[in-house]
């Protein structure tokens, strides 16, 4: 027997290790996809209004200032739990009215504070955007954001 590692043994270790880690990567990718589709996404609540709200979110580039579940900019508050912060679980009508009033009141004009631009949303657009924000609150975000205030 040779004192060191032979070429064929090294080749077998390389191919075996490569195959093992490729299969591990494929399994983890499949599991991640399965988890996202079956566990963390609220497909039942994904209505046309929620989809329209997502389009409004994208069209107005809200993600350039806000974040949802940590994705986006950190210039303005995290919005994945804004429905909860406005009391949507206890009083959905008041939460909808409060969110709509807040968005329509922008910009506040307070000196020294970051300002949200004014948006001229129709009632239907506002309702869809709020439906989208409500839907994001229902996603299993694994306790994100870490602070309730976003």
Curated annotation (Swiss-Prot):
It comes from the Bacteria. GO terms for cellular component: plasma membrane. Pfam families: Cytochrom_C. The chain crosses the membrane at residues 13-29. One of its GO terms (molecular function) is metal ion binding. It is found in: Cell membrane. SUPFAM superfamilies: Cytochrome c. Its main location: membrane. It is a single-pass membrane protein. Heme c binds at residues 62, 65-66. Keywords: Cell membrane, Electron transport, Heme, Iron, Membrane, Metal-binding, Respiratory chain, Signal-anchor, Transmembrane, Transmembrane helix, Transport. Heterodimer of cytochromes b (large subunit) and c (small subunit). Component of the anaerobic respiratory chain that transforms nitrate to dinitrogen (denitrification). This is Nitric oxide reductase subunit C. It comes from Halomonas halodenitrificans (Paracoccus halodenitrificans).
């Amino acid at each position: 027997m040779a004192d060191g590692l032979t070429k064929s043994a090294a080749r077998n270790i390389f191919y075996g290790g490569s195959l093992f880690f490729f299969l591990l990567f494929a399994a983890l990718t499949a599991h991640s996809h399965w988890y996202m589709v079956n566990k963390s996404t609220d497909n039942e609540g994904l209505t046309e209004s929620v989809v329209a709200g997502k389009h409004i979110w994208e069209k107005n580039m809200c993600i350039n200032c806000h974040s949802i579940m940590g994705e986006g900019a950190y210039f303005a508050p995290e919005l994945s739990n804004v429905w909860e912060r406005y009391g949507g679980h206890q009083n959905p009508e008041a939460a909808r009215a409060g969110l709509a009033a807040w968005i329509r009141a922008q910009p506040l004009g307070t000196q020294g504070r970051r300002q949200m631009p004014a948006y001229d949303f129709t009632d239907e657009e506002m309702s869809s955007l709020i439906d989208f924000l409500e839907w994001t609150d229902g996603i299993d975000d694994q306790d994100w954001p870490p602070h309730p205030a976003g």
